[in-house]
């Protein structure tokens, strides 16, 4: 069994994990029945883990979202699809490995699946550029989404990036233009689009594949205009104030659901998705199937209208009205 990577606030579980591993080794090396002791320790560890994860701060949720063993885009795709075919290239000489996409089927419905892909170790992260896509990655994604729109395939996107790559080469190749073009084009696609934030949803890098009819988000994922570290450095000239920035930025699923930015918060297993990836995959698949079933019943015109209205109300100053009241007011004005 691979060794689990424990976060700072999970340190109270270290001793329990050691005891559980020792008992498992004893069971392997002898015929002694230790099932009862093992069950008691695992139950205790699960209970303590639930207590810890019930009261996570926004800064701690960021640590969970960045966990190196958290399920990635490819992990979820492999759970969903037996017929996944990856498509490569932006048709302009590049094939960014930080943003992947391809064809598959979910519950017998052909779909396009795409998303950011991080690595599991240093070597993989270098290949994947730590999940930070370059302009070619967003142009590849756009090419695949245009293909999906042409052949009436729903689009499923998975967001997990600290942000778009901000190096000099990316700026020279038109990073801002590539993301802006994706935003514009995604508003016009006449197929259902479901986006899920499975880890980090960082800035424009997340938005580049995040214009969707339904925006889902895991319980311990984060969605932010800038990383708390960057925000703290800009506002207070002190990166140590990142925890305060994380709270002020409203980056958690609970906050974003209240603000009307996302449509559903998906629950995670005790300890986060990295503790039970199959359970996380089943949760995500069930939610996607439910939302996709609803969206497929809508006409192309209804999809476009709903998508436009959804984003039109974001960022509007709210003094006393609820998000629902503003949406209703906006719809009435259009009529």
From Swiss-Prot:
Its main location: cytoplasm. The keyword Nuclease does not apply. It is found in: Cytoplasm. Keywords: ATP-binding, Cytoplasm, Fatty acid biosynthesis, Fatty acid metabolism, Lipid biosynthesis, Lipid metabolism, Nucleotide-binding, Transferase. Residues 40-294 form the CoA carboxyltransferase C-terminal domain. GO terms for biological process: fatty acid biosynthetic process; malonyl-CoA biosynthetic process. Its EC number is 2.1.3.15. One of its GO terms (molecular function) is ATP binding. Pfam families: ACCA. Pathway: Lipid metabolism; malonyl-CoA biosynthesis; malonyl-CoA from acetyl-CoA: step 1/1. It catalyses: N(6)-carboxybiotinyl-L-lysyl-[protein] + acetyl-CoA = N(6)-biotinyl-L-lysyl-[protein] + malonyl-CoA. GO terms for cellular component: acetyl-CoA carboxylase complex. InterPro entries: Acetyl_CoA_COase_a_su, ClpP/crotonase-like_dom_sf, COA_CT_C. Belongs to the AccA family. PANTHER family: ACETYL-COENZYME A CARBOXYLASE CARBOXYL TRANSFERASE SUBUNIT ALPHA, ACETYL-COENZYME A CARBOXYLASE CARBOXYL TRANSFERASE SUBUNIT ALPHA, CHLOROPLASTIC. Component of the acetyl coenzyme A carboxylase (ACC) complex. First, biotin carboxylase catalyzes the carboxylation of biotin on its carrier protein (BCCP) and then the CO(2) group is transferred by the carboxyltransferase to acetyl-CoA to form malonyl-CoA. Acetyl-CoA carboxylase is a heterohexamer composed of biotin carboxyl carrier protein (AccB), biotin carboxylase (AccC) and two subunits each of ACCase subunit alpha (AccA) and ACCase subunit beta (AccD). This is Acetyl-coenzyme A carboxylase carboxyl transferase subunit alpha. It comes from Prochlorococcus marinus (strain MIT 9515). The lineage of its organism: Bacteria, Bacillati, Cyanobacteriota, Cyanophyceae, Synechococcales. The gene is accA.
